[in-house]
Amino acid sequence: KEFIVPLPEQVIRDQASRCMECGIPFCHDMKGLKGCPVNNQIPDWNDLVYRGEWEQASKDLHSTNNFPEFTGRICPAPCEASCTLNIVDSPVTIKSIECSIVDKAWENGWIKPQINQKKTDKRIGIIGSGPAGLAAAQQLSRAGHNVIVYEKNKKMGGLLRYGIPDFKMEKTHIDRRLEQISAEGVQFQGGVELGVDVEINDLLKQHDAVILACGAEKPRDLDIDGRNAEGIHYAMD
């Protein structure tokens, strides 16, 4: 089970009220700034939470992020490190607010399949079912394409499922989102490994486009002094 206890709604709204005391929101990943990598409109949905407009906050949050329940739990939160309140105080608890928004959206049934009735008849293959592959699948399906996701493991999710422990993010969050994506028309094929069960040239013939979202499972070594010391392991081990 996740070890983080959700904050009460009033505490979340109080935290959201601390936002926008800055002239320039450094929490955005603007040119020259190192804030949110996906450009979440953080001040906007913080203000909506402060006003109690949770459903609109969810729409705003999902406009830039397909899976805020994932990032709200496991993202290192460069937005909080960039918050200008760090100069005089602690930053706004942006991750906690993000989690609260999406969790409340699920609880209230605001997150529903978005099905495009106008199909393009284009067939798209996606290799890998991690967050990048799933986000691409969802967006392309909503654009009207026929999308098939191929995953070497039996279950979908990539490192979200096989690399993130339950105490940081429970698998129910992945399964719930997969149900939504499947309802939107995306097909999933597990136990299919590229280069073993299927060749890339065959996939290229079968699809109008193929996306490689295989992830970064192979660690990168560092040729630096002290690398051979005891107790140093790859993060992927």
Language model features with spans:
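Residue-level detector of alpha-helix initiation sites
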Residues: N66, G130-A132, K155
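Short low-complexity, flexible loop/linker segments enriched in glycine and/or proline
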Residues: Y162-D166, L204-D208, G226-N228
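Short, well-ordered alpha-helices that flank and scaffold nucleotide-derived cofactor binding pockets
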Residues: D103, Q138, R142, D237
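Feature captures the FAD/FMN-dependent oxidoreductase FAD-binding
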Residues: Q56, K118-K119, R123-I127, D175-I224
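N-terminal Rossmann-like FAD-binding beta1-loop-alpha1 element of flavoenzymes
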Residues: R123-I148
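Ferredoxin-type iron-sulfur electron-transfer modules and their immediate structural context
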Residues: K1-R123, K171, V210-M236
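Rossmann-like dinucleotide-binding cores of NAD(P)H-dependent redox enzymes
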Residues: N146-V149, N153-G190
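Short amphipathic alpha-helical segments
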Residues: Q138-Q139, R161-Y162, L222-G226
